[in-house]
């Protein structure tokens, strides 16, 4: 539920559209 290198992920992690680097963990 968080971005790699960040504390929070925006949008849907599965779509990889909520993370600046495009990588989401959990």
Curated annotation (Swiss-Prot):
- Where is the chain membrane-spanning? none
Q: Quote the InterPro entries the UniProt record gives.
A: Scorpion_toxin-like_sf, Scorpion_toxinS_K_inh
Would you indicate the residue range of the signal peptide? none
- Tissue distribution: Expressed by the venom gland.
Disulfide pattern: 3-24
Where is this gene product found? Secreted
An example GO CC term for this entry is: extracellular region
Q: Which SUPFAM superfamilies match?
A: Scorpion toxin-like
Domain remark from Swiss-Prot or TrEMBL: Has the structural arrangement of an alpha-helix connected to antiparallel beta-sheets by disulfide bonds (CS-alpha/beta).
Q: What is this protein called?
A: Potassium channel toxin alpha-KTx6 OcyKTx1
């Amino acid at each position: 539920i968080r971005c790699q290198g960040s504390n929070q992920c925006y949008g849907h992690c599965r779509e990889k559209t909520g993370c600046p680097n495009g990588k989401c963990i959990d």
